[in-house]
Amino acid sequence: DIIKRIKDAIDFIDDDLVLLYGDTISNIDIDKLFQFHRLSGNEVTMSVWPLISQFGIVDIDDMGKVTGFKEKPKLDKWINIGYFYFNRSVFDAIKESSSFAELIESFSAQGILGAYKHEGIHITINTVKELSDAEKNISSIYKERK
C-alpha cells in the first residue's frame, strides 16, 4: 500500500517529496514537472496522461446509422501516471490519511492539487503482457530523450 510506505519514510524526509510509481515507465521530463509545480503554486502536483480508448468509438444516431468512427482515440479524460511532487507542508495530511486515493481526493477538494500534462511515452506494467511489451520498447524510450 502506497500510503503505508510513505508514512514509514516520511519522518526521514527533510525536504519536499517526489514520489514515482514503480510500475510505470515514461519519458516524462522531470525538470519540466518540477518547474510546473513551482510556478503553479500548488502544494501537490500529479502527472497525468491522456486516456486513450482501447476500442474504436462509434457515434450512432437515433435511427441506428453510424455517424462517426474513430479508432482508439484520445478521450477527453486524463489518467494519473504516478509521478508526484508533494510540498513538505502537506506531510501532516499524509500522516493522517488512511489511503492514497483518499489523500489525493482530499488535496483536490482543498484546491491544492495540480496536474502536469504529459503527452509523451507512458507504459504501465501490470501484467506479463505489458512487461513483455515494455521490454521490447524500452530502448525507443531512451533514444527519444537524447
Positions of PLM-derived features:
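Conserved beta-loop-beta/alpha segment of the NTase-like Rossmann-fold superfamily
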Residues: 1-60, 93
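Catalytic-core segments of class I nucleotidyltransferases/pyrophosphorylases
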Residues: 17-18, 25, 34-38, 50-53, ...
